[in-house]
Amino acid sequence: MVSPDAVRTVLGICGNVISFFLFLSPLPTFIKICKKKSVEQYSPMPYLATLMNCLVWTLYGMPMVHPNSLLVITINGIGIVIEVVYIILFLVYCNGKKERVKVVMVVLAEVVFVACLTLLVLTLAHTYTLRSTIVGSVCLVFNIMMYASPLTVMKLVIKTKSVEYMPFTLSFVSLANGIIWTAYACINFDPFIVIPNSLGTLSALVQLVLYATFYKSTQIQIAERKAQIHLSEVVVKGGSLSNKTTNDGDATSPVSETMAPPHKK
């Protein structure tokens, strides 16, 4: 018979693998952004929230906070690098200085917060249990924020009736990630993991429901937009051809005058 600890270990490894693919899931979105050289209506909030989540979980996994948590440090350290790359690409292709300043200020605030939290925990909390509880509680809050961050995107989907700016891959991998980590934490109950990942599972389910609901209307909108672009090109080309024909006619047509015959008495 397989022991619960063995199952939990396997789920933990699977969770790390899925988390890695979760970090990579926005890659098609950023490839699209790079090709168009514009972030269009994509929001930076999911990536900023994920960066914050990775920062606090990396702190949680440190030996002086929660010993024997190498997997936690590894996967969240990788997550930090990936999210920083995404945010840099967003800064490069976002529209307007105001948006760039806003994103930079949020990143700076996150770094300052984690630095202050690290200093306070290491100086005021003198046991692993207390440090783990404090940092774990903070992780719980920011994990919930990470899963709640797509709410802004979901609002846009409902408003525009288009899922064009809500990547399916990200929603699907988020669902798988939430299910795996919820199951992992239920074997040896850990509220710091169960609560945020249960909410993450629910959030991902809602996103997939919205995707199924508005997928057809999205395709219609995309088709109409392409048709309008094609029509505009035809009109522009037709207008250019007409002007060319008119100009050619003016240049080659002789100017004739009708002279009245002399009047005879």
Where are the predicted features?
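Alpha-helical membrane-protein topology signature
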Residues: M1-K265
